[in-house]
Regions:
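Catalytic core of PPM/PP2C metal-dependent serine/threonine phosphatase domains
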Residues: 1, 44-113
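N-terminal entry segment of metal-dependent catalytic domains or homologous docking segments
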Residues: 1-36, 42, 49
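Active-site-proximal, acidic helix/loop segment immediately C-terminal to a metal-coordinating Asp/Glu
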Residues: 39-60, 124, 129-130, 143-187
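PP2C/PPM family metal-dependent serine/threonine protein phosphatase catalytic domain
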Residues: 2-17, 68-78, 106-140, 172-173, ...
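Short flexible coil/turn linkers enriched for glycine and charged/polar residues
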Residues: 11-13, 25-27, 80-82, 94, ...
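Short, glycine-/Ser/Thr-/acidic-enriched flexible segments
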Residues: 8-10, 27, 37-38, 105, ...
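Short hydrophobic-aromatic micro-motifs
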Residues: 29-32, 100-101, 149-152
Length: 187
């Protein structure tokens, strides 16, 4: 598993309202990307809190959907309007199969060569008063050699990102992440 990460604050802000984490529990690799609502320090704090809580619950033994449901309930009970979008990838390192859960998150992309498939769901972020019966399940993935999964936040324009991914050629994950961020600054 190879990762590339890049984050930039909105319009020159020194703080980015996004946060991410990558960790392993037994044979499962988890990748989390959260986008706090708003910009700057407040958004960053919301995103980092979501990451911290989800990571703690998953490493304690909760299944990913259960951890997300608990985070949703916590935000609803707290009722302070602070919330974060969630991209949560759970990938079995032995089989390369996994689930991608998206709550309120910008689209993700699966790239192989010049082919790009957009992945998105209609679930709102946790804490917006939506019960589990209105949440969509995750998207099942079976990753193949040479495929790249790209997770983005709403700071990256969809059309520009898709175009870049179709035409960028073979890049390392780090180079690809830098190119995706460049799409945001050019738009």
């Amino acid at each position: 598993l190879s990762l590339g990460v890049r984050a930039v604050g909105l319009r020159g802000d020194t703080l980015c309202g996004d946060a991410g984490a990558c960790f392993q529990v037994r044979t499962l690799q988890y990748v989390l990307l959260c986008d706090g609502m708003g910009t700057g320090a407040g958004a960053k704090a919301d995103a980092e809190e979501a990451i911290s809580l989800l990571r703690a619950m998953i490493t304690a033994g909760f299944a990913a959907p259960e951890a997300m449901a608990l985070l949703n309930e916590l935000y609803l009970l707290r009722g302070d309007g602070c919330f974060s979008t969630i991209d949560l990838l759970e990938l079995d390192l032995c089989t390369a199969e996994g689930m991608l859960y998206k709550w309120g998150a910008a689209p993700s992309y699966l790239k192989k060569g010049g082919n790009v498939k957009k992945i998105g769901t209609a679930s709102p972020p946790p804490g917006l008063g939506v019960g589990e019966e209105h949440r969509t399940g995750g998207v099942r993935l079976s990753l193949q050699r040479g495929e790249l999964l790209v997770l983005t936040t709403d700071g990256v324009p969809e059309a520009a990102c898709e175009q870049y991914l179709r035409t960028c050629g073979a890049l390392s994950p780090r180079e690809l992440a830098a190119g995706v961020v460049a799409c945001a600054s050019e738009s």
